[in-house]
C-alpha cells in the first residue's frame, strides 16, 4: 500500500495532486490565523498560498493535457501546455507580489494591532510542509523533465523563504512590541516572491518561443554527433527546442556521396538512438546531404575512396 502511494506521488499528476492537498490545508490555516491575528504578513502569505493553489490547479490540467499523445491537429504533441501553465503561474506570482507591496504600505500608513502568537505556530507548520513539498516536486520535475511541476516547485520553494521571513518578523513583534516590523517584513519577503515569478516567467517564455536547448544539452548533442564522425563528413544547421518534457532536434548530416541509401539510413538510426539515450524524450530529424569536392578539406573520414580518386585526378 505504502509503495503504491509513493509510486503515485512520484508521477507528474500524482505530485501535482499532492501539492494541491498540502497547499489547500495551509491556506485554511493561514486564513483563519490571519483573521485572528490581523497580521498583514500572514495575510500576504495566505494570498500567496491561494495563488499557489490556483496555479497548481492549472498545473494538474496542463500536465494531464501535455501527456496526451500527438494527434492529427497536434502532430508535435501537447508539451507546450506546460509552458503556458508555467507562464500563468509566473503572472499570478508577480500579481501576488504587487498585492503584498500595496497591502504592506497601507498597513505602515494605517497602523493595526496584531496578535503574533498563533501566527508563529502556523508559520512553523507552513515552513516545514512547504520545504518537504518543494523538495519532492523538484525531484519529480527533474525525473520527468516537467516545466509545469518545476514552476510549482519554484513557487513553493519561494514560500519557504517568505514564510521564514514572516516567522522572524512575528517573533520580533512578540519580543519588541514593534508592530511596524510586520509590514516591513512583508515588503522584504516580497522580493523572494518576485524573484521566483521572474525566473518562472523567463523559463516559460523561452519554451513557448522555441528557445534553443540549454548549453548542457547542446554539449551532449554535439558529443553524440562527434562520436559518429568516423563515418560522417561533417554536420551543420543544428536546431533544437523544447516543449514540456519533449525535446526536438534537427540537423543536416553530410555523408560520402557513394554511400548507399540503406547505409545512410542505418547511420541516421544509430545517431538518433545515441541522442535519445543521452537526451531522453527527444524527437530527432536528420537531413542527409552528399559530400562535394570542396568538403574534402574538412572531411573527418580518415580513409576515403572518393578523396583518393579526386587526388589522383588532380595529379593527372
Labelled PLM ranges:
Residues 1-16, 73, 78-81, 196-316:
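Peripheral (non-transmembrane) domains and long loops of multi-pass membrane proteins
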Amino acid at each position: 500500500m505504502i509503495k503504491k502511494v509513493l509510486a503515485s506521488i512520484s508521477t507528474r499528476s500524482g505530485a501535482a495532486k499532492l501539492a494541491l492537498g498540502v497547499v489547500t490545508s495551509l491556506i485554511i490555516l493561514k486564513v483563519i490565523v490571519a483573521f485572528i491575528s490581523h497580521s498583514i504578513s500572514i495575510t500576504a502569505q495566505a494570498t500567496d498560498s491561494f495563488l499557489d493553489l490556483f496555479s497548481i490547479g492549472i498545473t494538474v490540467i496542463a500536465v494531464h493535457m501535455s501527456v496526451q499523445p500527438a494527434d492529427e491537429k497536434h502532430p508535435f504533441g501537447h508539451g507546450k501546455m506546460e509552458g503556458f501553465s508555467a507562464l500563468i503561474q509566473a503572472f499570478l506570482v508577480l500579481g501576488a507580489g504587487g498585492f503584498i507591496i500595496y497591502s504592506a504600505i497601507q498597513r505602515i500608513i494605517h497602523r493595526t494591532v496584531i496578535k503574533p502568537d498563533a501566527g508563529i505556530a502556523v508559520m512553523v507548520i507552513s515552513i516545514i510542509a512547504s520545504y518537504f513539498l518543494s523538495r519532492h516536486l523538484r525531484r519529480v520535475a527533474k525525473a520527468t523533465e516537467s516545466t509545469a511541476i518545476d514552476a510549482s516547485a519554484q513557487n513553493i520553494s519561494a514560500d519557504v523563504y517568505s514564510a521564514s521571513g514572516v516567522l522572524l518578523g512575528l517573533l520580533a513583534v512578540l519580543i519588541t512590541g514593534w508592530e511596524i516590523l510586520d509590514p516591513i517584513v512583508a515588503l522584504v519577503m516580497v522580493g523572494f516572491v518576485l524573484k521566483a515569478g521572474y525566473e518562472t516567467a523567463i523559463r516559460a517564455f523561452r519554451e513557448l518561443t522555441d528557445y534553443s536547448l540549454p548549453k548542457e544539452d547542446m554539449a551532449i548533442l554535439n558529443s553524440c554527433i562527434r562520436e559518429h564522425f568516423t563515418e560522417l563528413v561533417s554536420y551543420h544547421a543544428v536546431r533544437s527546442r523544447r516543449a514540456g518534457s519533449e525535446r526536438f532536434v534537427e540537423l543536416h548530416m553530410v555523408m560520402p556521396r557513394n554511400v548507399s541509401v540503406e547505409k545512410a539510413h542505418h547511420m541516421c538510426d544509430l545517431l538518433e538512438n545515441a541522442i535519445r539515450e543521452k537526451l531522453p524524450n527527444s524527437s530527432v530529424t536528420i537531413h542527409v546531404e552528399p559530400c562535394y569536392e570542396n568538403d574534402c578539406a574538412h572531411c573527418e573520414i580518415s580513409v576515403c575512396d572518393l578523396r583518393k580518386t579526386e587526388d589522383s585526378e588532380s595529379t593527372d
